[in-house]
Design a protein with these regions (language model features):
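Short metal-binding segments enriched for Cys and/or His
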Residues: 165-176
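Short helix-coil boundary/hinge micro-motifs
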Residues: 1-136, 140-148, 178-194
Length: 194
């Protein structure tokens, strides 16, 4: 594990939220948000109304900017998100998780909790000097972000699907290059015969 469990979960959830904005947008309705809420493992207050959907959608560009920024801008964004939410870090233990930090209460609005959890995770990334783990997928045509949690920081793609797509494209390119090379057929002269 590169970071504490709660940090890794928050990074994964933040990237997943940002990636919902990529075409086609996958947060178009309150039902889409309800599905995302469950799949991303969120707990606590979830109004499930249009206002909450709007607030969550408006958070996505801020998180993407924070993810891709240089370190001084990341710090500024983190501090701004924490300040706006009046975040107050508390050590807590709940469910199956051991002691960890939360800087919001479960009763605060979902978008606020999402912003603060992402900001708190980025605090850990910054403090450990691991910002190079915040990446954009290398697959052609994909702009998804992800946290590279591999041991050697070598992950290049946001998903297995992108990795497979790029591997297949590279194979087709190699195959095409091999097919374009002149072959030595039975009737062609060799260098010695010329």
């Amino acid at each position: 594990m590169v970071f504490a469990h709660d940090t890794e979960e928050a990074l994964i959830a933040a990237a997943a939220l940002v990636n919902t904005a990529e075409e086609p947008d996958s947060l178009l309705s309150t039902q889409d948000l309800a599905t995302f809420y469950v799949e991303a493992g969120w707990k606590g207050q979830h109004a499930g109304d249009e206002g909450e959907l709007t607030d969550v959608k408006e958070l996505r560009p801020t998180l993407r900017r924070m993810w891709l920024a240089d370190i001084p801008e990341q710090v500024e964004c983190v501090n701004s998100l924490l300040r706006e939410a009046s975040a107050l870090p508390q050590v807590v233990r709940h469910d199956e998780f051991d002691w960890h930090l939360h800087a919001t209460t479960p009763e605060q609005p979902l978008a606020t909790r999402m912003a603060v959890e992402a900001a708190m995770a980025l605090v850990d990334v910054l403090r450990m000097g691991e910002t190079e783990r915040l990446k954009v997928c290398d697959a052609q045509g994909c702009e998804h972000i992800f946290a590279d949690l591999s041991r050697n920081r070598s992950r290049r793609y946001c998903s297995v699907a992108c990795s497979n797509r790029m591997a297949a494209a590279a194979y087709r390119d190699r195959k095409s290059d091999a097919d374009d090379e002149p072959s030595m057929s039975a009737g062609s002269p060799t260098d010695e015969e010329q």
